[in-house]
Design a protein with these regions (language model features):
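Short, glycine-/small- and polar/acidic-enriched structural segments
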Residues: 27-159, 167-170, 186-192, 207-208, ...
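Bacterial N-terminal signal peptides that target proteins for export
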Residues: 1-11
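Secondary-structure end/capping motifs
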Residues: 231-305
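Pocket-lining segment of extracytoplasmic ligand-binding domains
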Residues: 89, 168-169, 174-262
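Bacterial N-terminal signal peptides
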Residues: 9-21
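Short, solvent-exposed loop/beta-turn-alpha elements that line the ligand-binding surface or hinge
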Residues: 56, 110-113, 212-217, 281-290
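Solvent-exposed, polar/charged alpha-helical surfaces in well-ordered, non-transmembrane soluble domains
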Residues: 51-52, 74, 78, 92, ...
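Conserved C-terminal helix/tail region of periplasmic/extracytoplasmic solute-binding proteins
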Residues: 298-319
Length: 319
């Protein structure tokens, strides 16, 4: 009898340990490697990191920095990262080439009217006074397979200019001022925080806000993309990631003054530059119809070989 009671106590103890440890095991953080860029649209991601919102969702994020979305996507294909930020032009081009991608969250959308977080800049004393002076000139782009280039081409067409009359070259955002000084480019294309830095610190002049002047409506610009193969086995990772971002977006909307302080910290910028930053609209949900406007124009411009149905790229967390 005594032995029986001892066995029962041991069994009860094991059951109790399982009950107590079960939730802890279930709540163990999931881990994801995330490709990030040195740009203001990263603010919700960085905010979710700093405030522990991903951690509260049971997600451990491991960021890896890339120059641009077109560079980050190959890292996604090579499984160097699980999730990466990229513009929809690069995503659509890769999808058309056979890349099995899914969008799990949006990033930013442009405004329908200036000012906006994307500009063509020229030197303060440049003889380029308007967009109509750009034919024959060379424009620098962070990456050529980008929504920035697509938008600039649209601006040119809206002004009656053949996009082929302008030369496009790749120059990383941080190097465009030097390239301009050396004369290898006559105009820059930048987004924030480079836009504010070049205008407010270095005296460059805004020639055009290429998103609203190109598309005339608000369009989604970029967001978070994964491989379909990865998503099939990590839907919970995607859900927690999108939820952490959404909480960060809501926090930033409710605390605009805090947002500027966070940008100053995240991007190591002086207050003068941070105060001049134009912030585009954050949105975890993606306007598929707006993105389709851009992608359809790319077919006409030759940047896409045929129609890409953007809605088919969206995972439930981005709809």
């Amino acid at each position: 009898m005594r032995q029986t009671r001892l066995i029962l106590r041991l069994v009860a103890g094991i059951v109790l340990l399982v009950v107590l440890d079960g939730p802890a095991l279930a709540q163990a953080p999931l881990s994801v490697k995330v490709g990030v860029l040195p740009i203001v649209p990263m603010t919700p991601f960085r905010t979710a990191e700093k405030l522990g919102l991903f951690k509260e969702e049971g997600l451990e994020v491991k960021p890896e920095m890339f120059q641009g979305g077109a560079v980050a996507l190959p890292a996604l294909l090579n499984k160097q990262v699980d999730i990466t930020y990229s513009n929809w032009v690069s995503v659509a081009q890769l999808a058309q080439q056979g890349g099995k991608l899914k969008v799990i969250a949006g990033g930013t959308a442009s405004w329908s009217k200036p000012p906006d977080a994307g500009t063509i800049l020229v030197g303060r004393d440049s003889d380029i006074k308007s967009v109509k002076d750009l034919p024959g000139k060379t424009i620098g782009f962070n990456t050529l397979r980008s929504i920035e280039r697509a938008s600039v081409m649209q601006v040119l067409k809206n002004n009656g200019i053949d996009p082929a009359s302008v030369k496009y070259v790749e120059v990383p955002w941080p190097n465009q001022a030097d390239a301009h000084k050396q004369g290898s480019i006559q105009a820059l294309t930048v987004i924030e925080p480079f836009q504010s830095r070049y205008v407010n610190q270095m005296g460059f002049r805004v020639l055009a806000y290429f998103y609203p002047e190109g598309w005339k409506v608000s369009v989604p610009l970029a967001g978070w993309t994964v491989m379909q193969e990865w998503l099939a086995e990590h839907k919970e990772h995607a859900r927690r990631f999108a939820r952490g971002l959404e909480r960060a977006v809501q926090y930033l909307r409710q605390n605009p003054a805090e947002e500027r302080k966070l940008m100053e910290e995240f991007f190591k910028l002086p207050k003068l530059v941070v105060d001049g930053i134009v912030v585009n609209d954050y949105s975890v949900k993606v306007d598929a119809a707006g993105a389709q406007i851009v992608l359809d124009a790319l077919v006409e411009d030759g940047m896409l070989k045929g129609k890409v149905n953007f809605a088919e790229l969206l995972h439930d967390t981005a709809k």
